[in-house]
């Protein structure tokens, strides 16, 4: 019913991980092309915060395999709310679109990710992103006015 392909998506240093995907995006990749690839993608699945933010800003379905946050003395990831991605997704009421990585592993299956992508509340996310953009614009106007 849904035809989706996984494509390895680079960070500024390129793709430094092994993957079984038939496609990958190479570097150098201009910033606007990077942004556009996320904006117009069917979905983004990954570990980095900035692509999650771009996805949310544009209403692109996303799922985070999250390694951010604090770890204890033994290297165990603490799912204690310290992850910046967890915070952002919580603000957008998308906690189910995230799983934590602990010691390089997470209990995740493809069905869970695909269901999250298919049920992604695009209109709700776009509306909230627009609200934050407007709030940010007002804040910047106030800062500039205070400097004059």
Model-predicted regions and their roles:
Residues 1-148:
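Active-site anion-handling motifs in enzyme catalytic cores
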